[in-house]
């Protein structure tokens, strides 16, 4: 059943989406980046045109973004339109924000549900990978124990090849988190270029990592887009070429016991 709040917001945005009413729309959480928000009746996503298109946005991903940007008015609207209160609570920075969004009594998202995203969600589409990226990199409410579980799962599923090892280790040493590198790696491996572009926009310093990972998989699109002539990158690229010459093409592995052995021997 559609809530009264949802019906009211829909009626307001349909009748008052005019320039002279922007103050009202902002106050009600119906404006974002100078554009009026609509809920798509076809895919249930969010758009700016009140018509379905490939530009419709995932509500949960949009919710994470607006909370990070501290726009609680829009966050309340998205929650009334069906966005996940579990995600909202994960991104609230304090109890005041939880109370403002009325999510202080929402149960914590289970660790298993979050960890499942590492192995399943990124195979679907760009938006699902971006949700995983936001959860692992921008949420402030992960426990230390959960972060260690995430770290172990990432190490467990990363490609077990010397070239990937070398590339990850180079940028991990630069204080980039393993989860950030992992999400970017997945975007390249599954050719989710929209997600890749948005992640690199947040971490522009990782363009060399993107280029090298694209080079490992012979992805011409990635190599052309993120081409780099940095000396350190050239050196790392030469090592990859040497490794390719010795071991040939690369393949994915998910041998947890094998990767656990690496993780216990200063692999990272």
UniProtKB/Swiss-Prot annotation:
It is found in: Host membrane. One of its GO terms (cellular component) is membrane. Residues 1-175 are cytoplasmic. Residues 194-268 are extracellular. Induction: Expressed in the early phase of the viral replicative cycle. It is a single-pass membrane protein. Keywords: Early protein, Host membrane, Membrane, Transmembrane, Transmembrane helix. Coiled coil: none annotated. Its main location: host cell. The keyword Transport does not apply. The chain crosses the membrane at residues 176-193. Plays a role in virus cell tropism, and may be required for efficient virus replication in macrophages. Belongs to the asfivirus MGF 300 family. This is Protein MGF 300-1L. It comes from African swine fever virus (isolate Warthog/Namibia/Wart80/1980) (ASFV). The lineage of its organism: Viruses, Varidnaviria, Bamfordvirae, Nucleocytoviricota, Pokkesviricetes.
């Amino acid at each position: 059943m559609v809530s009264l709040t949802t019906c009211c917001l829909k009626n307001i945005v349909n009748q008052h989406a005019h320039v002279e009413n922007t103050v009202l729309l902002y106050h009600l959480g119906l404006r974002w980046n100078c554009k009026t928000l609509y809920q798509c009746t076809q895919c249930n996503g969010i758009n700016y045109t009140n018509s379905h298109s490939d530009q419709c946005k995932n509500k949960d991903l949009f919710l994470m973004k607006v909370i990070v940007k501290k726009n609680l008015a829009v966050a309340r609207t998205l929650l009334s339109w069906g966005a996940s209160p579990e995600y909202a609570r994960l991104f609230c920075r304090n109890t005041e924000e939880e109370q403002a969004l009325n999510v202080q009594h929402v149960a914590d998202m289970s660790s298993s549900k979050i960890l499942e995203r590492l192995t399943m969600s990124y195979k679907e589409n760009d938006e699902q990978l971006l949700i995983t990226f936001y959860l692992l990199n921008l949420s402030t409410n992960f426990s230390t124990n959960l972060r260690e579980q995430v770290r172990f799962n990432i190490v467990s599923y990363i490609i077990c090849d010397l070239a990937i090892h070398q590339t990850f280790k180079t940028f991990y040493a630069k204080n980039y988190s393993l989860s950030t590198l992992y999400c970017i790696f997945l975007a390249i491996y599954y050719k989710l270029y929209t997600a890749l572009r948005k992640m690199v926009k947040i971490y522009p310093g990782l363009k060399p990592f993107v280029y090298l990972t694209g080079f490992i998989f012979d992805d011409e699109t990635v190599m052309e887009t993120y081409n780099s002539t940095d000396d350190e990158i050239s050196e790392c690229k030469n090592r990859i070429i040497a490794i390719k010459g010795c071991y040939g093409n690369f393949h994915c592995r998910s041998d947890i016991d094998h990767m656990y052995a690496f993780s216990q021997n200063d692999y990272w």
